[in-house]
Amino acid sequence: MVSPSAADAGWRGVKSAMGWLRLARRLAPYVAIVAAGGALLATSPLGGDFAWSDAPRHALNGAFLKDLIAAMPRHPVAWAESYYLQYPSLSILFYPPLFYVFEATVFAVLGVTQFAAQATVVLFYTLLGFGIYRLTRLWASRPAALGAALMLMGMPEVALWGRQVMLDIPAMAWLVWGIYAFARFLKFDRGRDLALAAALLLAALYTKYNVAFVVVPLMSTLIAGRGRLVLRDRRLWWTVGAAAIGALPAIGLLLTFGSANLQSAADLSGELPRWSLVAWSFYPALLPQIVGWPVLGLAAAGLVALIAGRIPALKGWPTWLLIGWTVIGYVFFTAIAVREPRHLMTALPPLAVLAACALDRLLPRRTGGLVALAVGAGVLAWTVAYEPVPTVIGYKQMADYVAESVPANARVLFSGYRDGNFVFGLRTREDRRDITTIRADKLLLRIAIERRRGVGEADYSQAQIAALIRNLGIDLIVAQDSFWADLAEMRRLAAVLSGPDFAPAAHFSIGGTMGRTDKSFTIYRPNYPVEQKSRTLELDMPIFGGKIGGQLR
């Protein structure tokens, strides 16, 4: 006969085991999402082989912020200008600054490397997965919600930009969490959720400006969910007012330094006419490439089921939220002159939600969620295995060569398209923080971001260019072969380098899997004794209509 105490102990053991099982079920989705983030990091470029030209700039911006905090200079503006003169690929004020705060923190722990920068992006990629899981969980089962997270994380475009040091994924993560808090406010009517939504959406804005489109679908969802009660809810008015005030610094930064971003919203030469059919079909035609056929097909089925009233959980304001989020995003990004597949990503999380909810509600109970999970896992596995990230290889090797070849406090002239790759490569060399890079295009040309926005030439003669290089005390010239040879100034620079004052010291081929024009570089060394006569340098900054100048190292 079993004693009462033994039976009680056995029952407590069963209850404890059941409690641990429930905890494991709750934690399992988060563990799976973390594993997905780890798989993405493991398949990311990590050795200085940035493919997208802006990626090393975003990495350098984080290094700048880390160095600024470490230095705590008495004159931060002068210090920042001096930093730009040494590492002239900075773009920190041209973008919102929030991502760089996190990146600088990771750099402080792991060191300034591409791995640390990429790990920061993957952190947000993982948080994006958490966010879409929590959002979908409001309307679907736990397996289906995890399936939605894996579907979104496995979308080819999302996985691609999750493996580049860019702002798109961090902005999406903040946005999804902000919309999740907003949805909780509508569902549970708690003021703290509304305040949290405003804070998270402001964080998205301070990561990337183009998330601002979400205000329109959120307002329409609010009206659909609350009707005239919106006008009498003081919490809404206080929150909107506080959010508007919180957005003012971001607006100021955009207007002061973000003219290029504003130009992207205007018509640029070579872009599709804004109101043409080809412009408005640009993103729909690319949806299979951006989203992938499995998720796209399931999302279409989910939309049909939603319209037919077959997904009761999404009836009412959730329908307004999900459809408005995607439709308004599509309209917004189509209206912007510069159209790239990655821009539309911010509007695509509802497709994963619809796909998962369709399976969860249309298939037999419990089966649908498991099918959604299987689809999500399969999509992510396929993308990671068969959608490799493009790379450009060779710039880190050139930076290492330069670091090993120049004397203390050396000055290096760089002439090429991917200056960010080279400059960040030098910044990762903590043992050579004394080297200054000077960009030839900043000396000889006047160009804002890219050539199609207009190019001005300094009109120096060949002799003047040679004298400029000599007076600056350039120790090495890193020159992309045949770089912008259609411009007179660049042809004159090439002629100077092929003359008697310089000799080739090394040659590097640029490899990788991304199509590019930068095929090879030649590194030149002066044949004369180098003397640093010029102590100061002033550069035009047409991107914001000003100048940056100061003492050279």
Task: Place the predicted regions along the sequence by residue.
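Transmembrane-helix signature of polytopic, membrane-embedded enzymes
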Residues: P29-I33, F115, F130-G154, A173, ...
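Specific aromatic-rich, kink-prone transmembrane helix
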Residues: L65-K66, G129-G131, M151, P170-K187, ...
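Transmembrane-helix motifs of polytopic, lipid-linked glycan transferases
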Residues: A119-W139, W177, A181
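Membrane-interface transmembrane helices that cradle and orient dolichyl/undecaprenyl
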Residues: R137-P143, V176-L194, A204, A305-P312, ...
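Transmembrane alpha-helical segments
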Residues: A358-D360, G368-G394, F414, R432-I438
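Aromatic/acidic, Gly/Pro-rich catalytic loop(s) in extracytoplasmic/lumenal soluble domains
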Residues: A463-R553
